[in-house]
């Protein structure tokens, strides 16, 4: 089987599972979000192995699992976030000499990603629409950036650590994200105005920053891929870096302007 065939099969399987669990929501999607976070943490600790100790690994795994349990038990967003931040603070203080901020950053990155995705979906119907909106924006960004960049070329976006990305791709991805976001909003009869396109544009920008940041991390440790968990695609971090960055921003918007436990209420609750 060729690498392209493997990539296609993996993408179809993962896409089907993702969309089905997004539709189901509830505990199923929460478990899916936690699984993403655990995979991210595993790859982060492997990438930054030279900055990890036995304690940082064991502590990080244990703290992340308990964070996931708090999510499943629905103990409240603020409590769960507070617990996660406390764990990161402990790692930052105890592991600074050996790991600088890498162990703490990995725990927060994985934990907050799982939390953001899970709480954005929740059990509410508008949670489903919010996640679909997020997917549409991020996937439109990725696809359009790739093809637009290849077709038009031009100046590199960040040649030092992501030599294949171009400004033409980034701009094309942002334009596609706005279009994708508006399409989802129109399907649920969202009110007009500037809110949806501006939000889609911001999410697209943050998604691309998340992609670049993950490329920078890999460069720090001389890695081409974040791992080998996804046949034909490399690692989980390689596939979700932009998604979880955008999800974190979307969650923060919802938590600030609606409420931390039901962040999607502000977006598509009409």
UniProtKB/Swiss-Prot annotation:
This is Phosphatidate cytidylyltransferase. It comes from the Bacteria. Pathway: Phospholipid metabolism; CDP-diacylglycerol biosynthesis; CDP-diacylglycerol from sn-glycerol 3-phosphate: step 3/3. PROSITE patterns: CDS. It is an enzyme of class 2 (transferase). Its EC number is 2.7.7.41. It is found in: Cell inner membrane. It catalyses: a 1,2-diacyl-sn-glycero-3-phosphate + CTP + H(+) = a CDP-1,2-diacyl-sn-glycerol + diphosphate. GO terms for biological process: CDP-diacylglycerol biosynthetic process. Its main location: membrane. The chain crosses the membrane at residues 19-39, 53-73, 76-96, 101-121, 126-146, 183-203, 248-268. Keywords: Cell inner membrane, Cell membrane, Lipid biosynthesis, Lipid metabolism, Membrane, Nucleotidyltransferase, Phospholipid biosynthesis, Phospholipid metabolism, Transferase, Transmembrane, Transmembrane helix. Disulfide bonds: none annotated. It is a multi-pass membrane protein. GO terms for molecular function: phosphatidate cytidylyltransferase activity. Belongs to the CDS family.
